[in-house]
Amino acid sequence: MKQLLQNLRTGEATVAEVPVPIVQPGRVLVRTAASLISAGTERALTELGQKNLLGKARERPELIGKVWEKVKTEGISQALEGVRDKLDQSHAVGYSAAGVVIETSPDVTEFRAGDRVACAGTDYASHAEIISVPRNLCVRLPDALSFEAAAFGTVGAIALQGVRLAEPTLGESVVVIGLGLVGQLTVQLLKANGCRVFGVDIDEARIQLARELGAEGGCVPASAKEQILAWSRGRGADACIITAATATNEPIELAGEISRLKGRVVAVGLVGMNVPRNVYYQRELTLKVSLSYGPGRHDPEYEEHGHDYPLAYVRWTEGRNIEAFLDLIASAQINVKQLVTHRFPIEDAPSAYKLISGSTNEKYLAVLLTYDVDGEVGRQVENPVVTKKAAAAAGRVGIGLIGAGGYAQKMLLPNFKAAGVEFCSIASASGVSARDVGTKYGFAHFVSDAQSVIADEQANLIVIATRHGSHAALTVQALDRGKHVFVEKPLALNDAELDCVIAAAERSAGELLVGFNRRFSPLAARAKEVFQHRQAPLSIVYRVNAGRIPREHWTQNPNEGGGRIIGEVCHFIDLMQFLTGAAPTSVFAQAVGGGQGNVISEDSVFINLQFADGSNGVIAYLAEGDASLQKEHIEIYGEGKTFVIEDFRSARLYAGGREKKESLRQQDKGQADETRLACAVVAEGKPAPITLAELEATTRATFRIRDSLRTGQPMEVMIQSPKSKVQSPKSN
């Protein structure tokens, strides 16, 4: 299908062929008929893209600290390469569209195929022929409403939310500062609400348009103070709504100067917010900043997981705001037709971007993209530069990748490429990243559904790098097709899932590999060597400065991420299992304290583990430390020796009363050797480097840690897999 994409490095907009998105749970698939370009937001992205690296850094200063942390751990060349790769990705653009439902997820019952809907949301209601939209961001259209009018729904909701925050009453005098698209809609909403309206803008043509649409008066900012005082009968404005888009402080200053005592000011547009205290203090003004289309915005529970707010407590959510705005258009109280200055077919969308970028002197207001709703669209995209290959043959590794997120791009794919694999099929839910990453690495097919990758005869190693909640099911499907599987951690989120995976692995001809990479680090191998001839147990202290992850992050969701113990602590248990050569037999965990606000108590825990050979381990997994401290510090004690690993970049051996230091040129957590060994399993028939029993032991241990936190008791770790055994320390 065709989709408009923007490159953040250059700002260039192109129409590309991308796979049709899949219908994810809680979503509907919509065939787009029209979408509205949000000139302010989308122009800002274009301008950001056209800036050099320094300009982008100035625009996004919060990213500088993250880059510096990467420089310290990975080195400057890798950090800069990562920044460039991030900027060189294609981004879906657009967030206001309308079309016809063509498919729904089984759990969505309020919509059905054939429904005419308006759609909202960045990364959802994009400029694309087919879009996948969460249920709460879809609104059924009034019968007589056209698709072009409905495409204004999201932008109209932005204007409506600003009006709601201003709380205008019948007959009040309200000033709208900034008469772009949102401003013109705001003027009409206020007029429909029974208010007297005055518009301010630097463009005389827009002032005239506002008059035609219901404003009683209008002027340029230079004369606003005097004219508004006269227009308001010497009282000042009851409320000011700022819909301008400028980095300057002028709109917020002007709003204070023209407001009456105890007036209200609402900032809708992106403007300077250096509030002049004196005038706001002396007039006791109320200042509010509007949150996009309304309650629910940026809340994943509402937007992604489909949990609506009770109407009795939250009357106007973003979805209900869109619904109300569409009703106003349908009842002829809002005129959007007069706002449309340009229409472009989706194929010519780059011309629309040239228009809004200001590369021409042509004036515009509302710019619509139109679509052929009857044309054929392909669900799979072929890479034209890759020659088709025969079915997978012995001795070669053909990769089928499911999930094209940051970790896959940064770690997995470069290492698999270095190992000389063939890239066959790649899938991502949206299709955009599949196209981007697939093109970069030379994949033959770009798709959005995982089943197409698993069914690809050329792919004999299925790499799963999706969100955690899908790992187990995809692993079982791939193993049951006889494929080798490399799945990122965690292997499963609960015992039932793990049981299914173990059963599939035992009956499959394919090998199962899991991304527990730390055991393949050069420093982990060195530690293993130091204690290889030991006769006594080891004691291991593993401190992790994990940092905070907010409650609303997907990794904290029990169904998507499983939480940090299951999703991250598994790494550290596996490394301990590798160092001891023994399975964990029992665990006991205590949380640091009750989490408050956005802090989760289970994010900071002390975990005691006992291993089958008598070794003991302590994991201090802490989320409240300072980011400048290295993330991982490991101390291994045994038979009069101590080996210390610092963030997998340096190590110290204490033995015979002496200290010996060793360092790596850059941090190495073992990903390169991990992927090399995975390829050897497929190409040469070598055994999996981590046995099935070890994979099970690590994963079960994380479940028992959660149980221990809940019960306050030690928990036994029971391993069920008979296929392979954890090695004893004496066989090392």
Each language-model region and where it sits:
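Mid-domain Rossmann-like dinucleotide-binding core that forms the NAD(H)/NADP(H) cofactor-binding site
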Residues: 116, 123, 148-223
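N-terminal Rossmann-like dinucleotide-binding module
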Residues: 378-441, 461
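Glycine-rich beta-strand-centered segment in the early N-terminal region that forms part
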Residues: 21-37, 45-122, 683
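Rossmann-fold NAD(P)-binding glycine/threonine-rich loop
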Residues: 268-286, 290, 296, 491-511
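Beta-strand-loop-alpha-helix segment that lines the small-molecule cofactor/substrate pocket
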Residues: 260-261, 472-516
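Contiguous beta-strand/loop segments that form the cofactor/metal-binding neighborhood of enzyme cores
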Residues: 351-354, 359-373, 377-381, 567, ...
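C-terminal helix-rich "cap/oligomerization" subdomain common to oxidoreductases
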Residues: 354-365, 369-370, 375-392, 461, ...
